[in-house]
């Protein structure tokens, strides 16, 4: 019922897409601005060895910005989900008095939320806020999926090799720790 809600909200609220687009554009511009400031400050700090360090620092900044941007998306996605749930839950809770079948859950909330979303459009301020937040969250989720689908091949593949090496190193370390602990325990026991 999430997908049906999202599709219904997106169809009902075309304005929300424009609003989120402008917000996303501003956020992206902010990232570019911070990146330009860092690049401008790095050569000032090290003017003489400028040829090599800027390249490494730029690569590091790009990876750092990508990771930070991805983490920000993930952090943003969690509250978005909570916002969606919070925005969806009030409408069935309000309709609990009218329809006692809401508690069972998935099918009924869908039937109830659909007219509930149609009703808010008539009321001016409070209820329009909920569909816009949900629809903007939906657009954000879609954009996050697109961005994550594009970025992971670059960001995720390098960490895999160190992660594997860390796991492989960690496994014998754990075994060694267990063995040493057990032997020490045996010594203490003896």
UniProtKB/Swiss-Prot annotation:
Presence of keyword Zinc: yes
Bias kind Basic and acidic residues: ranges: 171-190
Main localization of the protein described in the UniProt heading: nucleus
Protein name (database record): Protein hunchback
Family designation: Belongs to the hunchback C2H2-type zinc-finger protein family.
Keyword Zinc: yes
GO molecular function: DNA binding; zinc ion binding
Keywords, in A-Z order: Developmental protein, DNA-binding, Gap protein, Metal-binding, Nucleus, Repeat, Zinc, Zinc-finger
GO biological process: segmentation
Region spans: Disordered: 13-59, 86-110, 142-190
Positions with biased composition (Polar residues): 90-100
Function: Gap class segmentation protein that controls development of head structures.
A GO CC annotation given for this chain: nucleus
UniProt biased composition (Basic residues): 17-31
Transmembrane segments: none
Cell location: Nucleus
């Amino acid at each position: 019922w999430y997908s049906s809600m999202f599709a219904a909200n997106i169809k009902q609220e075309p304005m929300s897409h424009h609003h989120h687009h402008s917000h996303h554009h501003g956020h992206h511009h902010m990232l570019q601005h911070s990146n330009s400031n860092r690049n401008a400050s790095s050569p000032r700090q090290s003017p003489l060895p400028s040829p090599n360090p800027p390249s490494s620092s730029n690569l590091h900044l790009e990876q750092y910005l990508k990771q930070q941007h991805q983490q920000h998306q993930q952090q943003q996605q969690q509250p978005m989900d909570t916002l969606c749930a919070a925005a969806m839950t009030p409408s069935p809770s309000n309709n609990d008095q009218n329809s006692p079948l809401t508690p069972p859950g998935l099918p009924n909330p869908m039937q109830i939320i659909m007219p509930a979303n149609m009703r808010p459009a008539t009321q001016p301020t409070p209820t329009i806020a909920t569909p816009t937040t949900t629809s903007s969250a939906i657009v954000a989720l879609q954009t996050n999926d697109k961005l994550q689908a594009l970025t992971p091949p670059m960001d995720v593949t390098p960490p895999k090799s160190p992660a594997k090496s860390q796991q492989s190193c960690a496994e014998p370390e754990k075994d060694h720790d267990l063995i040493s602990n057990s032997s020490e325990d045996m010594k203490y026991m003896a």
